[in-house]
C-alpha cells in the first residue's frame, strides 16, 4: 500500500506539473499567450513518449535484476536504455528547436511567437533524457516515496518560479520555471540512482549517443535552413535528409549505442 499510494500521489503531482505553467500564463498574460504556450507544452511533451516506452520495455527486466541483487545486470540494462533514449530523443528536441517557427505555425497564425522558448526547454529536456530511465529504476527498486518527494520538490520550484517570473519575463519566465522544475526532478532522481542505488552511466559510455544524437540532426538542420530557410519545404527536406542518414548511423553503431541490448530486453520481456 505504501508503494502504490506514493506512486499514485506522484502521478497526480506530475499532472499538476504539466498544466500549472499553462494556467499561470493564461491568468497573467491572457488566453492568446496561454494558447501559444500550451502548443509549445504539448509539442515538447510528445518527447516523453520515448521515455515512457523505455520504462515499459525495460522496467520488468530491471526489477528482476534488482530483486535478485544482480546489480551489474541492472546497470547494463540501464546503460543501454539511457543510450537509446538519448539517441532517439535528442534529434526530436533539436528538430523542434531548429524548426520551431514553422512547426508552431501549423497551429495557426501567431503561434510562431512561441518558437524562442523552445531553445530554453528543449536543451533542458535533452539533459533530462540523457540521465536515462532513472525514474524507472527508482520505481523498480521500490523507492516510490523518493520519487514522490522529488516530484513535490519539483512542484514547489515550478509554482514559486511561475508566480515570480511570469509577470516579469512573460513566456520566458514560464519556460524557465518549467525547465528548472524538470532539471531539479532529474538531478534528484539521478543522485538517488547513482549514489544510493548504485547504478550509473559514465560520460565515456554515453559519448557515442550524445555526439551522434546532437551532431547528425544539427548538421542536417543547418544544411536545410541554409538553403531553404524556415519553411514547410525546409522541414520536409530536413526529414528526408535526416531519416536515412541517421537511420544508417544508428544501424552502423547499434552495438555502441546499446540498441541491440535494448531490443534483446524487449524480446526477453515478451
Regions found by a protein language model. Give the residues of each.
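Interhelical loop/hinge segments that connect adjacent transmembrane helices in multipass membrane
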Residues: 1-19, 57, 61-76, 196-210, ...
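Alpha-helical transmembrane segments of polytopic membrane transporters and translocases
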Residues: 6, 21-23, 35-52, 82-87, ...
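Helix-terminus/linker motif at the lipid-water interface of multi-pass membrane proteins
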Residues: 15-46, 64-65, 101-110, 168
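Helix-loop junctions and terminal segments of transmembrane helices
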Residues: 40-82, 135-140
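Interfacial segments at transmembrane-helix termini and the short loops linking adjacent helices
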Residues: 79, 96-126, 132
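Membrane-interface junctions at transmembrane-helix termini in multi-pass inner-membrane proteins
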Residues: 122-153, 193-195
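Alpha-helical transmembrane segments of multi-pass membrane transporters
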Residues: 146-171, 181-194, 208-225, 241-251
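Membrane-proximal transmembrane or re-entrant/amphipathic helices at the cytosolic face
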Residues: 222-270
Amino acid at each position: 500500500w505504501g508503494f502504490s499510494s506514493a506512486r499514485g500521489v506522484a502521478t497526480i503531482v506530475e499532472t499538476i506539473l504539466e498544466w500549472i505553467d499553462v494556467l499561470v500564463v493564461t491568468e497573467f498574460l491572457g488566453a492568446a499567450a496561454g494558447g501559444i504556450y500550451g502548443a509549445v507544452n504539448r509539442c515538447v511533451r510528445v518527447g516523453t513518449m520515448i521515455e515512457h516506452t523505455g520504462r515499459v520495455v525495460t522496467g520488468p527486466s530491471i526489477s528482476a535484476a534488482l530483486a535478485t541483487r544482480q546489480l551489474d545486470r541492472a546497470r547494463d540494462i540501464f546503460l543501454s536504455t539511457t543510450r537509446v533514449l538519448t539517441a532517439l530523443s535528442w534529434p526530436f528536441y533539436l528538430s523542434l528547436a531548429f524548426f520551431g517557427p514553422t512547426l508552431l505555425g501549423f497551429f495557426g497564425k501567431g503561434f510562431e511567437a512561441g518558437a524562442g522558448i523552445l531553445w530554453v526547454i528543449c536543451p533542458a529536456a535533452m539533459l533530462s533524457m540523457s540521465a536515462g530511465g532513472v525514474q524507472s529504476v527508482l520505481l523498480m527498486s521500490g523507492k516510490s516515496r523518493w520519487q514522490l518527494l522529488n516530484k513535490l520538490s519539483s512542484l514547489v520550484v515550478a509554482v514559486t518560479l511561475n508566480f515570480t517570473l511570469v509577470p516579469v519575463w512573460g513566456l520566458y519566465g514560464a519556460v524557465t520555471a518549467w525547465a528548472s522544475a524538470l532539471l531539479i526532478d532529474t538531478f534528484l532522481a539521478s543522485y538517488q540512482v547513482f549514489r544510493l542505488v548504485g547504478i550509473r552511466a559514465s560520460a565515456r559510455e554515453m559519448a557515442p549517443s550524445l555526439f551522434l544524437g546532437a551532431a547528425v540532426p544539427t548538421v542536417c538542420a543547418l544544411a536545410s535552413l541554409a538553403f531553404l530557410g524556415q519553411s514547410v519545404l525546409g522541414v520536409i527536406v530536413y526529414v528526408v535528409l535526416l531519416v536515412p542518414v541517421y537511420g544508417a548511423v544508428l544501424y552502423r553503431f547499434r552495438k555502441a549505442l546499446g540498441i541491440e541490448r535494448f531490443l534483446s530486453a524487449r524480446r526477453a520481456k515478451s
